[in-house]
Amino acid sequence: MDLIGLPTLQDNYIWLLINPQHQCLIVDPGVAAPVLHYLTENRITPKAILLTHHHNDHVGGVAEIVQAYPEMPVYGPAETQGQGCTQVVADNDTLSLLGCQISIMALPGHTLGHMAYYSAPYLFCGDTLFSAGCGRLFEGSAQQMFDSLQRIIQLPDNTLVCCAHEYTESNLRFARHVLPKNREIETYQQHVTILRAKQQPTVPSTLRIEMEINPFLRCYDYDLQRNVGFPTQPNEIWRVFACLRNMKDSF
């Protein structure tokens, strides 16, 4: 399988997962034009659209793409039914597409109905997990988002984190702020700076990398707890996450 990230809008990525038969899945098409252009130029036939949540920068291109390919199914959570979804998915559902078994994961937090799609090694996680960061809490609670991230980290460490935005540089600045002595973050920040200077993407990263450099996955880290001024009991680690998310919102 080939994975293509199409940069769109200000900082979005639309993901295409392409098999050797030149068939593909489209994930979170916020706009249609770059998708339709890529499909035409490369003679690729789309077989399905996968939606993670209802925000317009993830669903805005659905109608135009379906107009060009009218028989194509659109999978998504119930919250996307008004944005072109034709097949509602729920937690622990499995899809069989392009010869892949795709597991559906409910990840509430950014929105209440947010879903992710996992087919090893690819995790299409929308706006839940970013490289070195996580999504804002527009609808869900801090505890819901913390639990969603805890679910993600149970996946294999070679999982490719196919998130929907190029936020890595700014996220790493915050990571350095709350974990200033973390050498892995410092080294990775240098790597990302070089990539962005060349206008190259920083995603997908791997879950292994994220466990090292993403403060939102390191809420058990004593240094992090001390630096944010919120040491807590093991059964209340989500409160560290809540404090961290509030800090990031105003950083």
UniProtKB/Swiss-Prot annotation:
Pathway: Secondary metabolite metabolism; methylglyoxal degradation; (R)-lactate from methylglyoxal: step 2/2
Substrates-to-products reaction catalysed: an S-(2-hydroxyacyl)glutathione + H2O = a 2-hydroxy carboxylate + glutathione + H(+)
GO BP field: methylglyoxal catabolic process to D-lactate via S-lactoyl-glutathione
Residues that hold Zn(2+) 2 according to the record: 57-58, 127, 165
Pfam (any one): HAGH_C
Stored Gene3D superfamilies: Ribonuclease Z/Hydroxyacylglutathione hydrolase-like
Cofactor(s) essential for the protein: Zn(2+)
Annotated keywords: Hydrolase, Metal-binding, Zinc
Binding site residues for Zn(2+) 1: 53, 55, 110, 127
Stored SUPFAM superfamilies: Metallo-hydrolase/oxidoreductase
GO molecular function list: hydroxyacylglutathione hydrolase activity; metal ion binding
Cofactor note: Binds 2 Zn(2+) ions per subunit.
Enzyme class (EC, first level): hydrolase
Self-association state and partner proteins as the record states: Monomer.
NCBIfam families (UniProt xref): GSH_gloB (TIGR03413)
Protein purpose: Thiolesterase that catalyzes the hydrolysis of S-D-lactoyl-glutathione to form glutathione and D-lactic acid.
Family stated for the protein in its record: Belongs to the metallo-beta-lactamase superfamily. Glyoxalase II family.
Name of this chain's protein: Hydroxyacylglutathione hydrolase
Organism: Edwardsiella ictaluri (strain 93-146)
Gene designation: gloB
